[in-house]
Regions:
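N-terminal G-site of the GST-like fold
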Residues: 1-75, 132-133
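A structural signal for well-ordered alpha-helical segments within the folded catalytic domains
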Residues: 21-25, 74-78, 100, 111, ...
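Generic structural signal for hydrophobic core residues of well-folded globular domains
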Residues: 29-33, 80-84, 109, 121
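Non-transmembrane alpha-helical segments in soluble domains
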Residues: 52, 77, 81, 103-106, ...
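Helix-adjacent hinge/juxtasegments
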Residues: 73, 77-99, 107
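GST-like fold's C-terminal all-alpha helical module
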Residues: 97, 105-150
C-alpha cells in the first residue's frame, strides 16, 4: 500500500555499513523523501544523550517515521515496503505463502550467513584492529558461506 503523502517525515540514522545501507537503499527504491543522519556504529555517535533518548539500544540503523520509531535493518526495510510500496516500486508479497518464503530467505541471509559468517569475517578482517585477528575463524566462516551458497 503506497501512502502518497508529500509530508512524509522519515529520518534514517546510520551510514557506513551494509546494515545501515539496507534501509537507505529501500527508501531510494521506493522514491521516498527522507533525511539521513549518517552516524557511524563505532564512532561514539550512537552513545550521545540525544541518540540514546531516541534509541536506547544505541545501534544503527534506526528509523523515525513521524512518531513511529524502529530499529533493525530488516524490520525497517519491511516496514518501509509495507507502508509505502506499490506495484511501481517495491511491494509486499500478495499471499501469506509468498510472505513466508520471503521470511525464509531473509532469515537465512540474516541468521545463517550474516550473523554466523559474514560478520565474523568483517570483525576479524576489516575490523581486526578493534576485535583482533582470528585466521582460523575467518577460514571457517568463508568456507561455511561457500558451502551454503553452492
Amino acid at each position: 500500500m503506497n501512502t502518497t503523502n508529500t509530508n512524509i517525515s522519515i529520518t534514517l540514522w546510520g551510514a557506513g555499513t551494509v546494515r545501515t545501507l539496507r534501509p537507505i537503499w529501500v527508501a531510494e527504491e521506493l522514491g521516498l523523501k527522507y533525511q539521513l543522519n549518517p552516524i557511524g556504529p563505532r564512532t561514539g555517535e550512537t552513545r550521545t544523550l540525544e541518540y540514546t533518548v531516541l534509541n536506547p539500544k544505541q545501534k544503527v540503523p534506526f528509523c523515525e517515521d513521524g512518531e513511529f520509531k524502529l530499529s533493525e535493518s530488516m524490520a525497517i526495510c519491511r516496514y518501509l515496503v509495507n507502508k509505502y510500496g506499490d506495484e511501481s516500486t517495491l511491494q509486499a508479497p500478495d499471499s501469506i505463502e509468498q510472505q513466508a518464503k520471503q521470511d525464509e530467505w531473509l532469515s537465512f541471509i540474516y541468521g545463517e550467513l550474516d550473523e554466523t559468517s559474514l560478520y565474523v569475517m568483517r570483525r576479524h578482517g576489516a575490523l581486526a584492529e578493534n576485535y583482533g585477528e582470528a585466521p582460523a575463524a575467518m577460514i571457517a566462516a568463508r568456507d561455511y558461506v561457500i558451502r551454503q551458497l553452492a
